[in-house]
């Protein structure tokens, strides 16, 4: 690997981690009063994938999970708009209506999560099937237990769609633990 690739990934991941730490502080001080879904500890997957996409000049459709701050920032989302979104401001990335859960930006092709666990797998699969554009879908380990996510994986395989599924194993799944 080239040195600048590794440094670029490190820089993206560091920005994401610092952002998450600052959000946590602001929530603790009640400066952010809306619910937030932090992704600290999960920043290297989106940082690495975003850097690969940048180097390969791929502008994928991105379907993030509810812990999407690092995804948004890694793929070039506007940090100021994200801060404003977390505060419910109209000039936030989702006009203050999506909050932490549903980060959306057509500028970076990122489509907000709707709140149903794993539903972004189905929505992203449909978007890819329709557009035939490279697509990245981020889900958590708990979402991988949902039947409709498994159906999406099957459909992607059958139709040979250009989709990368990224599963964040944060050990939050309640039905299937790693030990099993």
What are the functions of these language-model segments?
Residues 159, 164-180:
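Thiamine diphosphate
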Residues 21-24, 29-159:
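Cofactor-binding active-site loop characterized by glycine-rich and histidine/acidic residues
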Residues 10, 139-140, 173-175:
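Short, contiguous strand/loop micro-motifs
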Residues 1-34:
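Cofactor-/ligand-binding subdomain signature composed of acidic, glycine-rich
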